[in-house]
Structure formats: structure tokens, C-alpha cells
A protein has these predicted regions:
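Non-catalytic DNA-recognition/assembly elements of restriction-modification systems
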Residues: 1-17, 131-146, 158-190
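Short helix/loop capping segments that flank catalytic or ligand/cofactor-binding pockets
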Residues: 41-42, 95, 143
Length: 190
């Protein structure tokens, strides 16, 4: 298998601070911050101009702060100042699937955190990131890896939901058997 340094594959562009809007307007676009790399629970928007733009094919990585190394992909919009956009160079656009690159970087996030700089606020080390070696697999192999990993992620999510429901069932059975422990409605001796 051929390996390639990320520095050959990617170019980096740092995000910018913007005025944040809670509601979307006709002139606004999505404003992506660190929380958005994990989920879409709290969408924010901006009308600020001259922003760093992310396209769905780009990889986003939290560059600064306690969450440095957190990775997101498949997002589009204006990018906040603590995030860097990783764009595939022309030579590799058709050779590397963004999801494959994204899961590779997710697997390296702890390593990137451990090698970050800054005494009080961690910052990713650009050289460490760009020196990472990516295995250059065929498109079909990349798609297969993504399919398997997505299946695993779905199963993990389902299992977590099952455990949450089981925890609620245990609490419910406890209350049914012994009553509410706060008001002791079953009059147990304390």
C-alpha cells in the first residue's frame, strides 16, 4: 500500500470570527463552530462577509482550545475562528473520499491533542498534522471501510439508546417497589 503525507493531500485555511445570529435570514448562511462538528443540535447563522467557507467535501478540525483535534465532515457554511478547513488538493480530489479522510483524522485526534502546543490554550501543531501518513487505498476499499465504520457507529448509537432505556426501567422498577426515595411515600424506616 502506498502512503502519502497529509501535507501533499491537503491545504489548510483558518476560520474567522463572525457576528452570530440565532435565526436564519435570507442573507445568512450557516456558521459552523466546534459544537457543530459533533452534531446539528444548535444551528447558528451569520451574515458576515469575507468568511472562510467550508463545502461538504471539506474536512473541518477544531484547531484551538480544549476540543482541539475534534473532526467534522459533510458540513457547509462559514467557519468559526477556532476551526480550520482542510481542502483536498486537486491531485487527490478524485483519489480520496472525504469520509475516509475524516475517519482517518478522527482516529488521530488524540495523537494530535497530545502533540498540541500552548501552555494554557492548546493549539494543534500544523507540522504534526501535515506529517501524518495516510494509506492511499482504492476508492472501492475506502467505500468499504466507510460502510463498515458507519454500521459500527449506528450499532453503538443503538446500544447507547438501549442502555439509557434500561437505566430508566431500573429507576422505574425501583420507584414502583420502594416508592420515591425523596418523599418516602411507602413509609420505610429511615
Amino acid at each position: 500500500m502506498k502512503k502519502v503525507k497529509l501535507g501533499e493531500v491537503l491545504s489548510l485555511k483558518k476560520g474567522k470570527k463572525a457576528t452570530v445570529l440565532a435565526e436564519q435570514t435570507t442573507l445568512s448562511q450557516r456558521y459552523i463552530q466546534i459544537d457543530d462538528l459533533r452534531n446539528n443540535n444548535n444551528l447558528k447563522f451569520t451574515e458576515s462577509l469575507n468568511m472562510t467557507e467550508a463545502l461538504p467535501d471539506d474536512i473541518l478540525i477544531a484547531w484551538d482550545g480544549a476540543n482541539a483535534g475534534t473532526v467534522g465532515y459533510g458540513l457547509s457554511g462559514a467557519v468559526g475562528s477556532t476551526i480550520t478547513v482542510l481542502k483536498k488538493n486537486e491531485r487527490y480530489k478524485e483519489k480520496i473520499i472525504s469520509d475516509y479522510l475524516g475517519v482517518f483524522l478522527e482516529s488521530k485526534s488524540q495523537y494530535l491533542r497530545e502533540h498540541s502546543t500552548g501552555a494554557t490554550i492548546p493549539h494543534l501543531n500544523k507540522n504534526i498534522l501535515l506529517d501524518l501518513q495516510l494509506e492511499l487505498l482504492g476508492i472501492e476499499e475506502q467505500e468499504n471501510i466507510i460502510c463498515i465504520l458507519n454500521t459500527i457507529k449506528r450499532l453503538i448509537t443503538k446500544r447507547k439508546l438501549q442502555l439509557d432505556e434500561l437505566n430508566l426501567l431500573v429507576k422505574s422498577r425501583f420507584n414502583e417497589m420502594f416508592g420515591d426515595p425523596l418523599n418516602n411515600n411507602k413509609k420505610f424506616a429511615v
